Amino acid sequence: MFKFNDDKGQLKCSFCGKSQEQVRKLVAGPGVYICDECIELCNEIVQEELGTEEEIDMKEIPKPVEIRKILDDYVIGQDMAKKSLSVAVYNHYKRINSGAKIEDVELQKSNIMLIGPTGSGKTLLAQTLARILNVPFAIADATSLTEAGYVGEDVENILLKLIQAADYDVEKAEKGIIYIDEIDKVARKSENPSITRDVSGEGVQQALLKILEGTVASVPPQGGRKHPHQEFIQIDTSNILFICGGAFDGVEQIIKRRLGKKVIGFGADFGDGVKGDLKAGEYLKYILPEDLLKFGLIPEFVGRLPVLATLEPLDEETLVRILTEPKNSLVKQYQKLLSLDGVELEFDNGALLQIAKEAIKRNTGARGLRAIIEQIMLDMMYELPSREDVNKCVITEETVRDKVKPQLLTKEGQELHEETA
C-alpha cells in the first residue's frame, strides 16, 4: 500500500499512489486516503460481485399497449392472447408496486393459463414477456413433477430454477416469471376425485396450489429431495407470476358438448352467438373454467389461474409470416449465417409456402419450422463456405418439395448448374 503522504508532505491516494493534484477528489479516512477514481473502481468491483439489484419501478413498467407492441415484434398472430397477457402482466406488476393493497382492498394474484396447440407460441410469449420486463425467467415441465415423497421432482425445484436464473438473488427472483409447460398432463384421469394416489396428476396439482397462491417456500439449494440436515433457501412466491401452458387435447370436445352437440343444420346457432359450423381449433376461444374441471383439473387449481388466454392453430399464411417478419425470424438468422461466408441467401415465396405446408403436415406448428429449414440448408451450409465462386443462394419451391439443389449464382448473376440432391 502507498503512503498517504510523501516526504514533502503532499497527500496521496493510499491505493493508487496518485497525488491530490492528479485526482478530482481525495477522501480522508483514519490514517488513509482514497481518490474518486479508486472509489469508482471499487464500486464497479462490488457491483460485479454482488449484482445490481434492479427494482421494478412503476414508471418503468410498460403500459399494456406498449407490451403488446413489443410482443408483435417477436410473436406473429395470436392477437387475443397478446392482449390478455399484456393486461394481466401489467396488472400483476402494478399490484407488486402498490404493496398488494390499495385503500385496504387486497389485490389478488392474476396467474395465467395459456391454452393452445403445440407450436402455437405459448413458451415464446412467456419468454418475451420476461425479456420485456427484464425479470428472471424459468421454464419447468409439469410431466417431470410428482407429489412429495415419490420418485420425480418436487414442485420446489421449479423455484430453484428461478433462483438460479436470478443468480441466487432471492429478492430479484421473487419478482420473476415461471412458465410451467405441459400443465394439461397433470390432469386427473377422471372428473371424479380419485380414491387411489395419483402422484403425477392430482397430487401435483395439490402440491402446486400453495406456491401459485403465495407462500414462503423452502427450496433445497442443490435441488433434489429435501432431507432434514440441509439448509434451505426461503423464497416468498406471493409476487412471482406463474404462467401455465398446455395443448389440452380433447378439451374442444368438452366445449362442443357444452355449447350443444346436437345442433341440426349447417350454420345453426349454438346460442350466445356461437355458430355450429366452427372448425377445429375455433372452439378454444369459448373455453370456460368449467371445461377445465371436466378435463381433469381440480377446482382449487383452476381458481389459482384466473386469466385464461387461448391461442389459435397456425395456418399457412401465419407460418410464412413467422418465417420472415419477427426481428429474430428463422430466415433472417440463416441469411446472417451465410452472409458471414459472403453469400446472400434468398427464399422465394413458393419455398416459404411449401415450408409452411410441411410444418402443418407434421402437426408441429412453428416449432417444426427450424427442423425443416435445417434439413433444406444442411448441404448448402456444408458446401458454401468452401465455394468462392458462389455469391447468392436461392431456395425455391422445388428445393423444398422435390429436394432439388438451390439456385447458385455468381457475382455476375450467372447461374451455376448443379446436380439434383
Curated annotation (Swiss-Prot):
Residue span(s) of domain ClpX-type ZB: 1-54
A GO molecular function held by the record: unfolded protein binding
Keywords attached to this entry: ATP-binding, Chaperone, Metal-binding, Nucleotide-binding, Zinc
Listed GO CC annotations: HslUV protease complex
Gene3D superfamilies on file: 1.10.8.60, ClpX chaperone, C4-type zinc finger domain, P-loop containing nucleotide triphosphate hydrolases
Domain of life: Bacteria
InterPro entries: AAA+_ATPase (IPR003593), ATP-dep_Clp_protease_ClpX (IPR050052), ATPase_AAA_core (IPR003959), Clp_ATPase_C (IPR019489), Clp_protease_ATP-bd_su_ClpX (IPR004487), ClpX_bact (IPR046425), P-loop_NTPase (IPR027417), Znf_CppX_C4 (IPR010603)
Residues involved in Zn(2+) binding: 13, 16, 35, 38
Keyword Zinc among record annotations: yes
Binding site for ATP: 117-124
Function recorded in the entry: ATP-dependent specificity component of the Clp protease. It directs the protease to specific substrates. Can perform chaperone functions in the absence of ClpP.
UniProt record similarity statement: Belongs to the ClpX chaperone family.
Subunit structure: Component of the ClpX-ClpP complex. Forms a hexameric ring that, in the presence of ATP, binds to fourteen ClpP subunits assembled into a disk-like structure with a central cavity, resembling the structure of eukaryotic proteasomes.
Protein name (Swiss-Prot/TrEMBL): ATP-dependent Clp protease ATP-binding subunit ClpX
Organism of derivation: Brevibacillus brevis (strain 47 / JCM 6285 / NBRC 100599)
Lineage start: Bacteria, Bacillati, Bacillota, Bacilli, Bacillales
